[in-house]
Regions:
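Zinc-dependent metallohydrolase catalytic domains
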Residues: 1-51, 55-189
């Protein structure tokens, strides 16, 4: 049986502001981020989502630095933290849990759909009951999986981002108003 550990995103990718470059650790080229014979959904739900998270994490750091130095930057809002830019008027939603996961999900999913260019993704052998879209979300959630200390795996960040993302509800047929498809949703873009 495999072990589940929480992954610190800062250990997987780094953004160098001086060089304007993002570096991703070689370990990211293994599951759950990258599957050598995976589908397009697995590529974008894994490595694509990781890269998008890295970029949004870096943007928030840049916004905080800009705020601290009182410079104007196109990514800084009045507080300097992009997590506040997640448009969410729901008091029960922890906006800190949504950032950078919700904007990264929005970007990775848009890239996935663009890569498909209107075609259907391949079905996974042994998991034919899942559409490519569902595999995208399953892979994304797998990258966020952590152990709760009692031996159970869970993903609060996955749940927080997925419940606010309409394509997730559509892919899994979540009933409107249910816990994974609230009528009012938060968004970044």
């Amino acid at each position: 049986m495999s072990q589940v550990y929480r992954v610190d995103i800062t250990a997987l990718c780094q953004y160098n502001q001086a060089l304007l470059k993002t570096a991703i650790a070689p370990v990211s080229l293994d599951p759950p981020f990258f599957y050598h014979n995976g589908t397009t959904a697995m590529l974008y739900g894994g490595l694509g989502f990781l890269f998008a998270r890295c970029l949004f994490f870096a943007l928030d750091v840049v916004a905080q630095i800009a705020d601290a130095t009182n410079r104007n930057t196109p990514v800084a809002d009045e507080s300097g933290h992009l997590e506040k830019a997640v448009r969410c008027q729901q008091p029960e939603v922890d906006q800190e849990t949504l950032y950078p996961f919700l904007p990264a999900l929005e970007v990775a999913h848009a890239a996935y759909k663009k890569a498909l260019n209107g075609s259907q993704d391949a079905r996974l052998k042994g998991m034919e009951q899942y559409s490519g879209e569902q595999v995208f979300f399953l892979t994304m959630c797998h990258t966020l999986c952590e152990e709760d200390g009692r031996g159970s795996a869970w993903s609060p960040a996955c749940n927080a981002a997925a419940r606010e993302f309409e394509p997730f509800a559509k892919a899994f047929g979540c009933e409107s108003g249910s816990s994974m498809n609230p009528k009012k949703k938060c968004n970044f873009f």
